[in-house]
């Protein structure tokens, strides 16, 4: 069994050197991701496609491979195929017939062929021959070229016939690391998750910068969002997660800054700090989730004033998106439930915010800050490899317990993603098992029976530890981590 990875059309339009570089990078990215699923994964690059071979003795890996490929930037779509050899057009038909006889019975169908290589026939001739045979010697209703119920997709390359058994849509975009790195400001809300994802999809290695305004609970929640985005869409490359203790800045704003200017001043301080951190990391651009007119600090006038605080390029991919469109995208990429349970701290700072800030007035207000405030904040910022989030949680999860056995009055919660749970169901005789995906746990845990103890389970124990710590920070103490 094989997968044929089709390149995103924008890659195909590049010049030959650029196209080769992008394709080679995509091959490397695919290999990096799939090797974590199985060491025997084979990835081979061609001019216009990339082949992925599922080990013959491990056909069960096909679904896992397909799911991972669907989340790798730079891929238009993936087709799962079975491989056959052929000697003639009739030989092709004879091999297609037993595979599709039952599938097209009582249905309309058509045959579509894509061919590469030198042959004494063309694609249309194969479509007519195979389609005619299937129409004559099966119980199909007939051929329908437009909107058929079943499409028989065949690909021919040299003397090999590939029958397409499944088509998986890809992310599109460019392969990771074909663009320069960016530093994304992430709060855990709807907007910042989507803006981060859009730059991952565009091929930029996206590092995360979090301004902590709400203590450990806020940081844990944001780390879950960042880890989810990286693990799902950007796992092929290492990135950094930078946590900035921003409470001192907020304290000085509340104490010293005019109420109407607070929101704009806060954003300017964030941009200054992020720019300093980005420069240290060799990054040339900051990404934010700001959308025009969404809140008072996001008017054109205020955004202009905010941008004047630094020479660093500030990118706003959501600038013209409606809020509902952002939420819909948030739901699609799997960060909606995180965002729903994430507290919002920035919105309470200014009671009567200005929508037309004057640069001179803002700069005058900023002279009230302690001279070394930004320097102190930058020095206190902590940057970690995002892969270390799980290890870091291990050192902070002393308040909870990891268990291997299950006692009475304990319920196991399988927090894996639905498709992962379906592929490998957790079954424990005599034990109640609830299935609540990790991204819904924060919003649904409060509805559970508080008299019971809940054991969180996931395959590797990473997300279960993050979720346990998050729930403990929220005041729940009837939670443990289950590691059988």
Curated annotation (Swiss-Prot):
PROSITE patterns, A to Z: RHODANESE_3, THUMP
Binding-site list for ATP: 185-186, 267, 289, 298
Domain Rhodanese: 406-484
Pfam families with a match to the protein in the record: Rhodanese (PF00581), ThiI (PF02568), ThiI_fer (PF22025), THUMP (PF02926)
Coiled-coil annotated spans: none
Origin superkingdom: Bacteria
Keyword check for RNA-binding: yes
Residue ranges occupied by any THUMP domain in the UniProt entry: 63-167
Pathway where it operates: Cofactor biosynthesis; thiamine diphosphate biosynthesis
Keyword match Nucleotide-binding: yes
Reactions accelerated catalytically: [ThiI sulfur-carrier protein]-S-sulfanyl-L-cysteine + a uridine in tRNA + 2 reduced [2Fe-2S]-[ferredoxin] + ATP + H(+) = [ThiI sulfur-carrier protein]-L-cysteine + a 4-thiouridine in tRNA + 2 oxidized [2Fe-2S]-[ferredoxin] + AMP + diphosphate; [ThiS sulfur-carrier protein]-C-terminal Gly-Gly-AMP + S-sulfanyl-L-cysteinyl-[cysteine desulfurase] + AH2 = [ThiS sulfur-carrier protein]-C-terminal-Gly-aminoethanethioate + L-cysteinyl-[cysteine desulfurase] + A + AMP + 2 H(+)
GO-annotated cellular components: cytosol
UniProt-annotated catalytic positions: 458 (cysteine persulfide intermediate)
Keywords: ATP-binding, Cytoplasm, Disulfide bond, Nucleotide-binding, Redox-active center, RNA-binding, Thiamine biosynthesis, Transferase, tRNA-binding
MF GO annotations: ATP binding; CCA tRNA nucleotidyltransferase activity; tRNA binding; tRNA-uracil-4 sulfurtransferase activity
CDD domains reported for this sequence: PPase_ThiI, RHOD, THUMP_ThiI
SMART domains cross-referenced by the UniProt entry: THUMP (SM00981)
Any single GO BP term: thiazole biosynthetic process
Enzyme nomenclature, EC number: 2.8.1.4
Family: Belongs to the ThiI family.
Functional note: Catalyzes the ATP-dependent transfer of a sulfur to tRNA to produce 4-thiouridine in position 8 of tRNAs, which functions as a near-UV photosensor. Also catalyzes the transfer of sulfur to the sulfur carrier protein ThiS, forming ThiS-thiocarboxylate. This is a step in the synthesis of thiazole, in the thiamine biosynthesis pathway. The sulfur is donated as persulfide by IscS.
Protein name: tRNA sulfurtransferase
Source organism (scientific name): Shewanella sp. (strain ANA-3)
Gene behind the chain: thiI
